[in-house]
């Protein structure tokens, strides 16, 4: 504990002396933090209040972890907790120290090794205790996904298997996955639950091949009761990993084990995903989450304010909810910014303060970035084509020309690489994208009608 305190003191000294953050910000957010304990590769740090914890996680985590690495020479994870939690943690550690002082020393033979189940679970990620069904705000955009998740939690491998949840970033997919895991864990003691991202699954698989431990890898992932795998779209293009996940999926499904999957898009729209995997994802239930409406956004803000015992008026919540209309993470982040700003300037939180906070503390909002999917949807709508035709293998002129326009716009309006654009159009080769771009570029110069179509679609994309 002394080491953690000294380490954190040194980290703060570096930041303050080298002015890595403005003095006012340092005094407001960092000065009152303290190193609590070092738990393995995780440094526990206390902060005065819940909103401070949230602010530090959002705004300073990268700076602090980089500085810790600079001071110690090792990369440590930082976990922020409230002062009350820190006190409880220290009291508990002190009790353990007292017991250890009066108890006879144990020999190595007396140590109880972790069971294989405990080892597997510790290696496969932890559930976030904040993400439960009780803390999930239900609205029109997520009602069905919530109901399906609860049904799966109440009857794993009996209701819908697999359950596939898709939707944009920050809309609550991960929350529901953790809620399922927490519910099953509470209701069915001893159930083996694993929550992993597709990236972790991929890395574990690669490491198992490198270390010649594929048998252990398979035992780890196939001897569980509930598998929650996040962001499955990142398996796209990874043929060997897809092969391994296919067999993992089959093993679990055949053993009547529950599988829950999340993605930013439905299975049929994940590029270069093997058909056999896509078909298995469609065995169970596919449900989406859409951006919350105004009433739901206000309810989300109210729940967060109540959870952190903050007094925020309905007028302020209405203002914030009116400004942030797509992403729950940004919505909650905006509330945190408003509270932080009010504390910093010593004013009561009202709509005027909220407006100042979101104007001054949040960076000026950049124009929304156009995505390849946005372009595909606009082109489909403009030419009155089914969306899937742009990705299909059809080469008729009525489809090939709009597809080439969409590829051209993807090259002009996004930062995506040629292979990435090709992937999003049914797994086409990058040379196809180059050909499409060259052809439409020539037509724009020589054919006035093509130029008008391009400008019209661009205008719609920029003002949608």
Curated annotation (Swiss-Prot):
Subcellular location field: Cytoplasm
Predominant subcellular localization, coarse grouping: cytoplasm
Top-level taxon of origin: Bacteria
Ligand binding (ATP): 170, 172-174
GO CC terms in record: cytoplasm; plasma membrane
Gene Ontology biological process terms from the UniProt entry: DNA replication initiation; regulation of DNA replication
Keyword check for Nucleotide-binding: yes
Spans annotated as Domain III, AAA+ region: 126-342
Entry keyword Nucleotide-binding: yes
Keyword tags: ATP-binding, Cytoplasm, DNA replication, DNA-binding, Lipid-binding, Nucleotide-binding
Annotated region described as Domain IV, binds dsDNA, given as residue ranges: 343-464
Gene Ontology MF: a single term: DNA replication origin binding
Region of interest called Domain I, interacts with DnaA modulators, as start-end residue ranges on this chain: 1-82
HAMAP family per the UniProt record, alphabetical: DnaA_bact
Function of the protein: Plays an essential role in the initiation and regulation of chromosomal replication. ATP-DnaA binds to the origin of replication (oriC) to initiate formation of the DNA replication initiation complex once per cell cycle. Binds the DnaA box (a 9 base pair repeat at the origin) and separates the double-stranded (ds)DNA. Forms a right-handed helical filament on oriC DNA; dsDNA binds to the exterior of the filament while single-stranded (ss)DNA is stabiized in the filament's interior.
Entry-linked PANTHER family: CHROMOSOMAL REPLICATION INITIATOR PROTEIN DNAA
Family: Belongs to the DnaA family.
Domain remarks in the Swiss-Prot or TrEMBL record: Domain I is involved in oligomerization and binding regulators, domain II is flexibile and of varying length in different bacteria, domain III forms the AAA+ region, while domain IV binds dsDNA.
UniProt-recorded name of the protein: Chromosomal replication initiator protein DnaA
Species this protein is from: Exiguobacterium sibiricum (strain DSM 17290 / CCUG 55495 / CIP 109462 / JCM 13490 / 255-15)
Taxonomic placement: Bacteria, Bacillati, Bacillota, Bacilli, Bacillales
């Amino acid at each position: 504990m002394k080491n953690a305190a000294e380490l954190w003191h040194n980290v703060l000294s570096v930041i303050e002396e080298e002015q890595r953050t403005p003095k006012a910000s340092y005094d407001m957010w960092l000065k009152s933090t303290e190193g609590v304990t070092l738990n393995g590769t995780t440094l526990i740090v206390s902060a005065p209040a819940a909103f401070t914890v949230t602010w530090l996680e959002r705004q300073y985590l990268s700076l602090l972890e980089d500085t810790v690495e600079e001071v110690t020479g090792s990369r440590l994870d930082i976990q922020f907790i409230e002062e009350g939690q820190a006190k409880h943690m220290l009291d508990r550690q002190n009790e353990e120290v007292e017991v250890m002082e009066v108890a006879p020393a144990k020999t190595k033979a007396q140590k109880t090794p972790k069971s294989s189940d405990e080892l597997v679970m510790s290696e496969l990620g932890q559930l976030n205790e904040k993400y439960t069904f009780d803390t999930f705000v239900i609205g029109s955009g997520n009602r069905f996904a919530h109901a399906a998740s609860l049904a799966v939690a109440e009857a794993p491998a009996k209701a819908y298997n697999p359950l596939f949840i898709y939707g944009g970033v920050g809309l609550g997919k991960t929350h529901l996955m953790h809620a399922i895991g927490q519910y099953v864990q509470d209701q069915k003691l001893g159930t083996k639950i694993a929550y992993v991202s597709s990236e972790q699954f991929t890395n574990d698989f690669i490491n198992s091949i490198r270390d010649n431990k594929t048998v252990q890898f398979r035992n780890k992932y196939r001897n569980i009761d509930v598998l929650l795998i996040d962001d499955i779209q990142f398996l796209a293009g990874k043929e060997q990993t897809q092969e391994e996940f296919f067999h993992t999926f089959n093993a679990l499904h055949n053993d009547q084990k529950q599988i829950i999957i999340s993605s930013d898009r439905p299975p049929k729209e994940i590029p270069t995903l093997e058909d056999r995997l896509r078909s298995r994802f469609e065995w169970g239930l596919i449900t989406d989450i859409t951006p919350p409406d105004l009433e739901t956004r206000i309810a989300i803000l109210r729940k967060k304010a109540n959870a952190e015992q903050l007094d925020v008026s309905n007028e302020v919540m209405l203002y914030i909810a009116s400004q942030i209309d797509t992403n729950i993470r940004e919505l909650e982040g905006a509330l945190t910014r408003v509270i932080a700003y009010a504390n910093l300037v010593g004013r009561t939180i009202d709509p005027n303060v909220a407006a100042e906070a979101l104007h001054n503390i949040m960076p000026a909002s950049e124009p929304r970035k156009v995505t390849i999917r946005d372009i595909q949807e606009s082109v489909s709508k403009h030419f009155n084509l089914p969306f899937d035709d742009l990705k299909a293998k059809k080469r008729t002129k009525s489809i090939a020309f709009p597809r080439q326009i969409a590829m051209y716009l993807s090259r002009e309006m996004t930062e995506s690489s040629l292979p990435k654009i090709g992937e999003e159009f049914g797994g086409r080769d990058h040379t196809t994208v180059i050909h499409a771009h060259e052809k439409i570029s020539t037509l724009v110069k020589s054919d006035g009608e093509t130029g008008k179509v391009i400008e019209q679609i661009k205008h719609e994309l920029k003002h949608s």
